[in-house]
């Protein structure tokens, strides 16, 4: 079971799922199965069965984008997002009414594919609102005088721990 973090809100793939209005940026999921790998719009996709530990391990099957897993950016880059939008938009070129085509793109499973990161370790920024038994603080930029922003970051990092801070 690979632990994954959703890195962009998604409002699809939740048919029959109770208690989840949408899949939120920061939600943790566990990979149960992955299949149907394909490349489209310059990106790599797959179909994944994932469960959500914070929602009684309810499972969904969703289209996922694999490129975000090892990307240094927080989610798809602007260029990747634009390439995805343009590619999906071309798939609906037969819809001549602009508004209807836009709606079709917004409902497309590729356009709405889950953007994921590995969640074995996450940054302080991504952890806001969550708590973990152990928190490891690695900040190589300590200075003699900390700014207000530094102190706020440190407070957030420390208060994520329920048992131990390293």
Residue ranges and their predicted role:
Residues 1-166:
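Core RecA-like ATPase module of SF1/SF2 helicases and allied nucleic-acid translocases
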């Amino acid at each position: 079971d690979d632990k994954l973090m959703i890195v962009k809100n998604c409002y699809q793939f939740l048919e029959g799922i109770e208690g989840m209005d949408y899949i939120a940026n920061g939600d943790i999921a566990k990979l149960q199965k992955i299949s149907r790998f394909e490349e489209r719009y310059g990106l790599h996709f797959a179909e994944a069965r994932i469960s959500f530990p914070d929602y009684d391990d309810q499972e969904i099957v969703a289209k996922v984008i694999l490129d975000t897993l090892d990307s240094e950016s927080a989610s798809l880059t602007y260029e990747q997002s634009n390439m995805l939008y343009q590619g999906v938009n071309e798939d609906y070129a037969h819809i001549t009414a602009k508004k209807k085509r836009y709606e079709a793109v917004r409902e497309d499973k590729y356009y709405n594919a889950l953007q994921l990161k590995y969640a074995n370790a996450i940054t302080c920024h991504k952890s806001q609102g969550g708590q973990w038994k152990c928190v490891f603080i690695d900040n190589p930029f300590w200075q003699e005088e900390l700014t207000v922003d530094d102190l706020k970051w440190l407070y957030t990092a420390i208060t994520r721990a329920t048992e131990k801070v390293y």
